[in-house]
């Protein structure tokens, strides 16, 4: 089990996602609704406890924010909560959207 997260580029995040990694988006609900990585799950301070309770702590977890800054703190938090394979997306959703515009979706969080 690692006690630190890894910062990764969109290319690595996409490969992890294609191999079944959970992708969580920690941006505000309005930003998520306007655009997010396809298949990602929106979480906030209210839903994080339920997410952790239901999550596979050993499965890869990619954390996404706006530009890759806030996701680092969130990734460290997930490590503290027992996740063993955590990544922070460098450049955040903004870089992802510029690199993979076809791999984005819009709409409210489920």
Swiss-Prot record:
The active site is at 65 (cysteine persulfide intermediate). InterPro entries: GlpE_sulfurtransferase, Rhodanese-like_dom, Rhodanese-like_dom_sf, Thiosulf_sulfurTrfase. PROSITE patterns: RHODANESE_3 (PS50206). It is found in: Cytoplasm. GO terms for cellular component: cytoplasm. The keyword Cytoplasm applies. It comes from the Bacteria. It catalyses: thiosulfate + hydrogen cyanide = thiocyanate + sulfite + 2 H(+); thiosulfate + [thioredoxin]-dithiol = [thioredoxin]-disulfide + hydrogen sulfide + sulfite + 2 H(+). The keyword Phosphoprotein does not apply. It holds the Pfam family Rhodanese. Its main location: cytoplasm. Its EC number is 2.8.1.1. GO terms for biological process: glycerol metabolic process. GO terms for molecular function: thiosulfate-cyanide sulfurtransferase activity. It is an enzyme of class 2 (transferase). CDD domains: GlpE_ST. Keywords: Cytoplasm, Transferase. Gene3D superfamilies: Rhodanese-like domain. SUPFAM superfamilies: Rhodanese/Cell cycle control phosphatase. Belongs to the GlpE family. Transferase that catalyzes the transfer of sulfur from thiosulfate to thiophilic acceptors such as cyanide or dithiols. May function in a CysM-independent thiosulfate assimilation pathway by catalyzing the conversion of thiosulfate to sulfite, which can then be used for L-cysteine biosynthesis. PANTHER family: FAD-DEPENDENT OXIDOREDUCTASE (PTHR43031), THIOSULFATE SULFURTRANSFERASE GLPE (PTHR43031:SF6). This is Thiosulfate sulfurtransferase GlpE. It comes from Pseudomonas paraeruginosa (strain DSM 24068 / PA7) (Pseudomonas aeruginosa (strain PA7)). The lineage of its organism: Bacteria, Pseudomonadati, Pseudomonadota, Gammaproteobacteria, Pseudomonadales. The gene is glpE.
């Amino acid at each position: 089990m690692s006690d630190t997260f890894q910062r990764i580029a969109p290319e690595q995040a996409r490969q992890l996602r294609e191999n079944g990694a959970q992708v969580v988006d920690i941006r505000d609900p309005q930003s998520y609704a306007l655009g997010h990585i396809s298949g990602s799950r929106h979480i906030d301070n209210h839903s994080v406890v339920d997410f952790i309770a239901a999550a596979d702590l050993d499965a890869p977890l990619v954390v996404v924010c706006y530009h890759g800054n806030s996701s680092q703190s969130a990734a460290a938090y997930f490590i503290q909560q027992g996740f063993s394979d955590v990544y922070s997306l460098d450049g955040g959703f903004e870089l992802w959207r510029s690199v993979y515009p076809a791999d984005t979706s819009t709409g409210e969080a489920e």
